[in-house]
Amino acid sequence: MFRWWKTAAPVAAGQPPAPADAPDDLLLAQLRIFATAPSLSVVDAGAHHGQTAEQYLTHFPGSRVIALEPDPENFGIAQQTLAPFGDRVALLPLALAETDGSVSLRRTSHSGAHSLLEVGDMRYYDAPVETLAPVEVRAVSLDSLCAGHGLDRLDILKMDIQGAELLALRGAADLLARQAIGLIALEVLFQPLYRDQPTFWDIADHLRARGYALQGLHDQRQHAVNHAVLRWADAVFVAPRLQALS
């Protein structure tokens, strides 16, 4: 889970979150890779309360961000967080998926653990997680989203969508075939938090087959009790056009 928002102060009902932490290792890696870029196009899928999009908009001043957050409560908080950035950000109430259409968002008692997948073995989570009633939300594929916004290429794709990352990558078949996404920063899971959930190895195989290389694993989290077991991390993959620069 992206530390940029996981470590933010608790949010009171109806109030925007406190500003996120200073750049961590994951963001610094991206800042180094794009140090000379005058402007960036970014898609933030799983925007939660808007903290990650806020970091991109703050630390990449020339960037424009499309942020997706399907949960209505999270979306409302993200609106407040991102309001100061005006038309540099488009916040949309959408889930990123393999195809366009309506999908069921499985909600939980932890606002950062909602998923398109059913809850699995939550023993690997930090605290007890209860399943709530699902809600129907609209979904879009990345290929469709970018085409609709006139984006032929994308500099950064960030995803924190709780086990549905491989589904979303399958919905980016055209972009990935053209290696048109420069950098992909995403949460990767090593343990089955959700049913039928792909792991890091599935995602790495999918991206490696399309020419992407692993830049690194950041913010690795071990099991709270058995520290020998890796639960999740944030991974960065880069397209061939960036591999000589990273």
Give residue spans per PLM region.
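Phosphate/nucleotide-binding beta-alpha loop and adjacent structural elements of enzyme active sites
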Residues: 1-246
